[in-house]
């Protein structure tokens, strides 16, 4: 078998799992990512529909502290909640978990935080925080327009560690997740 044939087999059988939360954490635009994958002949085998937490970090100290305190309610020991900060100049700072981000919370160069906490996809606002739900909507709109995978999976797994005000009956929560995704695909 020649190299081109082998490469074709690999690209047919080794495919990418597009986790919407992970790409959103890195501030990647869904259409640009999918275009680049296509340009390289790489296929998406599965989309994991998931949302991260995010918030702009104001320069005003009191407003900034309110945002940081809101993130603190999501600090828990079961999962790592990596934080990727975007600076005002457009650079990225990676923190391995929330405590390291909290230690740098007064960094005035940081304009936004995104945290790897798979929050329910059906909620956009976690006042004063929000989610990366818009990225999910963008991916699903692209899937509707020109399907690029047959495998969609909702990947919220943090039900047991959500702050108390966000907890609901697990059956109801999962049903809401699936209904929300179906609504996006039907619109």
Predicted feature locations:
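Acidic/histidine-rich catalytic cores of soluble enzymes
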Residues: 1-102, 110, 119
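Flexible, acidic glycine-rich loops studded with aromatic residues
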Residues: 43, 87-186
């Amino acid at each position: 078998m020649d190299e081109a044939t082998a490469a074709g087999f690999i690209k047919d059988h080794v495919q990418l799992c597009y986790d919407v939360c992970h790409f959103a954490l890195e501030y990647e635009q869904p259409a640009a990512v999918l275009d680049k994958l296509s340009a390289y002949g790489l296929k998406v085998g599965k989309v994991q529909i998931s949302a991260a937490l995010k918030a702009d970090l104001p320069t005003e100290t009191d407003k900034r502290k309110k945002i940081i305190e809101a993130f603190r309610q999501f600090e828990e020991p079961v999962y790592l909640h990596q934080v990727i900060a975007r600076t005002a100049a457009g650079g990225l700072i990676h923190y391995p978990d929330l405590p390291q981000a909290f230690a740098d919370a007064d960094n005035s160069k940081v304009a936004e935080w995104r945290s790897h906490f798979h929050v329910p996809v059906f909620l956009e606002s976690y006042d004063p925080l929000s989610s990366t739900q818009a990225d999910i909507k963008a991916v699903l709109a692209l899937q509707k327009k020109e399907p690029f995978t047959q495998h969609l999976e909702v990947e919220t797994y943090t039900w047991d560690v959500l702050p108390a005000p966000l907890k609901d009956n697990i059956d109801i929560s999962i049903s809401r997740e699936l209904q929300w995704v179906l609504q996006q695909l039907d619109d």
